[in-house]
Amino acid sequence: FYFRPQNDVVLEAGSRYKYTVKVNATGLTLEGCTIGSWVDGGGESGEAEDLGYNYDSNTKTYTVYNADGLMNVAELVNGGKTDINITLDKNIDLTGKGWTPIGTDYDNSYTGTFDGGGHTITGLTVTTNDEYAGLFGYLGNFNNGAATVKNVVMDGIQITCNHRSGYAGGVAGYSWGTIENCSVSGSVSGTMYVGGVVGVQRDGSITGCSSSATVKGTIKVGGVAGQTIFGATLTACYATGNVNIEIDRTQDISGGGLVGFNDGISLLSCYATGNVTSTGSSTGHVHIGGFLGDNYITVTACYWKNNHEQGISYNRGSTNVTKVDGTNVTWENAVDAMNTALQNAGSEWRYELNGALPT
């Protein structure tokens, strides 16, 4: 058969399209297309290939409903379709499947919107010598900071980046974009820039995100982000996973329960409870704190409780963080203060004290 588009319709190989099919005396007709020269198939039978996603050409959105679909869409992005939108329609189990991060580097960064719809991605595993590792390798860029990842739960991930100057995070290795309402559990391990959610957040924002992942790195290491720089903001984020710094013996070191090196523009209503430990020594500066390793900005209504007595190891900002000691400061006090600060900032995010810790 052949397609005769009535409008300027482009049908791409490897994509799926939905049409209304009408059967009449003269043949089959589709809305917007005509099928002609129909020939019977000679008695063969079979099933169409299931790509694991549906495609809406009007919105450039791929709706993914299984693991193969997510892997196929990742291939599309890494093959050059970097601005497509991706939506999860089901929980996705990647257990036993090798994962190649979406957006391989700056020149092939993902610039669309990924909406997890509150669904869970389970068992994502990355072991790579490439520079960027995570669900996304590289998110956004200088020309397009509108890239967004939101509403996804990353459960039981195992990310290992062996590149000597690598960037590793549960959601993204390197981000210029927006990351919102994402949570991470499992483990993230790398070298230079390592965080439970992102390795580096440059500009853009991380809002309402959390990590219980165990994080291990060597230079800039944090429970949520290894490093924040330039216009980056962190709002209503928390980390409960342990952070371990295997100190590089010649480099300046920054490690913290929330962020290793904090030099964005805003850090508001965040907390950290995971223990922060280190091994080794360095000829450079070593700054390791319960909340932040290095800080260069104003920190508002932030708290920590872990094995460190010092919340910020090296503080060039104008404010400090508060330790929850259970006597002078409780988590009830912290929730009240964090929510007041969020309200004053015009944010819709709020904490609730569910059990021992706020969520």
Where are these regions (language model features)?
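Extracytoplasmic cysteine-anchoring/structural motifs
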Residues: 1-51
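Surface-exposed repetitive/solenoidal architectures
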Residues: 47-359
